[in-house]
Amino acid sequence: MKIKQFIYILFLTAGFLVGLPYAYASPLINGEDLAVSIRNAIPPENILIEASMEVTQKNRKRIQTALTIETKLLGQDEFMTTYKTKPESNRMVWQIRRKVGMQNAYSCKPEENSNIHVGIAGSSFTLADFGLEFLHWPSQKTIKKQRRKSRLCNVLESKPMKSIKEKYSRVLSWVDEKSGAIIAADFFDINGEILKRFTVKGLTKKNGQWQVDELEMRDLNEGSKSRLKLNY
C-alpha cells in the first residue's frame, strides 16, 4: 500500500495532497492553498483494512484494541471513514463524513462518546485529529522548508480564531513534498507548549512502493504513547 493510500484511511486525505501539482515543490507555497488542497482530496476507491491500536500508559501498562477502518466513497466529492472496534460485543463506532468545500460531519456510537476531542479506543488519536480539524482554522501559513526523516517538507502552521475555544493553540505539520503526506505534526496547548507529537513510523518498501505500517501519537502531558498498526 502506498503512503498516499494509507493516509487516506487514517487522515481522510489520500496522501493529503492528491492532485497537488509538483510545481509546488520549489517555492514556499501559500499556506491556505496547501490546506485547501489537503482538505479537498478525495480517495480514488473504497478501502477496508484491519488495524490495532496499542496504547502504552505512563505506568507502562499496555492496552490493545483491534479495529476495522473503512473508507467509502459517497460521490465524486464526498466520502466517509468509519472506525470500528472488535469484537462486535460492546463495539464502538466513530465516523467522519467529508465533502469538498464543507465542514466535516462526525458521529459516534454509543452517542455518549460523541466528544470529537476524546481519544479513539483510549488512545491519544482523537476524531478531530483524524478529521484534520486544524486545517479548517482561519490561519494557515507555510513558514519554512525543512527536512524531516531525511525528506524535504513544507512546514505548515495552523492557528484557530482567538475567540474560539480549541484544545490546541496551533499545529505545525511537516508535509512531504514528494508524496504530499503529513509525516509529522506537533500540537500545541493554550500555553504554547507541545501537547502531542505525531509521526509516521514503520516505513518499508515493498514491490517498489512505500508502505506505512504504523502511526504514532505521543501525549507529552500524560506521558503516554499510542501506536496505530496496520495489518496487511
Located regions from the model:
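Short amphipathic beta-strand and strand-loop transition segments with alternating hydrophobic
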Residues: 69-72, 141-147, 201-203
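Generic short beta-strand segments
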Residues: 51-56, 86, 157-161, 218
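Bacterial N-terminal signal peptides that target proteins for export
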Residues: 1-10
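Mid-chain, structured segments of secreted extracytoplasmic proteins
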Residues: 67-108
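Gly/Pro-enriched, hydrophobic low-complexity segments
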Residues: 128-129, 151-232
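One face of beta-strands
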Residues: 47, 51-53, 67, 81-83, ...
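Flexible, processing/modification-adjacent segments and terminal tails
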Residues: 26-34, 40-46, 61, 89, ...
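N-terminal leader/targeting segments and the immediate start of mature chains
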Residues: 15-62, 70-76
